[in-house]
Regions:
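P-loop NTPase catalytic cores that bind/hydrolyze ATP
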Residues: 91, 99, 109, 205-213
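Short glycine-/polar-rich loops that comprise or flank the Walker A/P-loop
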Residues: 7-8, 90-91, 124-128
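Charged phosphate-binding loop/patch that engages nucleotide di/tri-phosphates or the phosphate backbone
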Residues: 180-218
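Acidic beta-strand-to-loop metal/phosphate-binding motif
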Residues: 13-14, 89-104
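Short, surface-exposed loop/strand segments
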Residues: 1-88
Length: 218
């Protein structure tokens, strides 16, 4: 058990390493805007963060499952790393995943294995919410297309590459910037993500890219 005095816990269950980095940077931005601090526990084997504001402390744990197909198996992690380890606080859970298509119906992520995942964690969660990105997380990043171009040193008149997925488009932009320079996912994408205009991404994604479905009154 852990006796640190937290007010509440927030669990992010994310699809891949790039999603983890993106939401880490997004949390940093939100904390900065609200006069809060966010600190990563470098000694923990988990992706563990503490958000502090005045006398309040909020625990954040992020589970990177590797692929959307593995996300439905994450209930074990939630019960072990969150509920059992910090049983004295309430938990809000965010399921962060790609729908893989711009017109994909989010309701399919409430059926089958996904329904069983929600049922297995809902008794120990104060709320469960979906952060569903249409196609790749890179599509979200491309909402700040000018920011991506600036990071790569490309002219601001550079056209958006063709391709169905954002990951394909970003890879093309990296090659256009430098044929020897490749786009890397995960931690190596942090430098790019840190330069992006999160406010702009948030503005665009609220209507076109990220769909946030709430449940249980969250």
């Amino acid at each position: 058990m852990n006796d640190y005095s937290y007010e509440k816990g927030i669990a992010f269950i994310v699809e891949g390493a790039t999603e983890r980095v993106f939401y880490e940077e997004y949390l940093k931005k939100l904390c900065s805007e609200r006069g809060m601090t966010i600190t990563k526990d470098e000694k923990s084997q988990e992706n563990k963060y503490t958000i502090c504001a005045e006398n309040r402390s909020i625990l954040v744990l992020i589970n990177n499952v590797g692929s959307v197909s593995q996300m439905t198996n994450s209930a074990t992690w939630f019960h072990r790393a969150c509920v059992k380890e910090y049983s004295n606080i309430g938990w809000s859970v965010f399921l962060c995943y790609d729908t893989d298509a711009y017109n994909s119906d989010i309701t399919k992520f409430h059926e089958g294995d996904w329904l069983r995942l929600r049922q297995s964690i809902e008794s120990d969660a104060e709320s469960i919410a979906d952060l569903a990105a249409q196609a790749d997380i890179e599509d979200v990043m491309l909402c700040d297309f000018q920011g991506v171009l600036a990071f790569l040193g490309l002219d601001n008149n550079t056209p958006m590459p063709k391709g169905r997925k954002g990951k394909v488009k970003i890879k093309q932009l990296f090659r256009r910037s430098d044929p020897a320079c490749a786009y890397h996912e995960g931690e190596r994408a942090r430098a790019l993500i840190q330069t992006l205009d999160i406010d702009l991404i948030e503005k665009h994604s609220s209507s076109t890219t990220i769909r946030h479905q709430k449940s249980r009154g969250f």
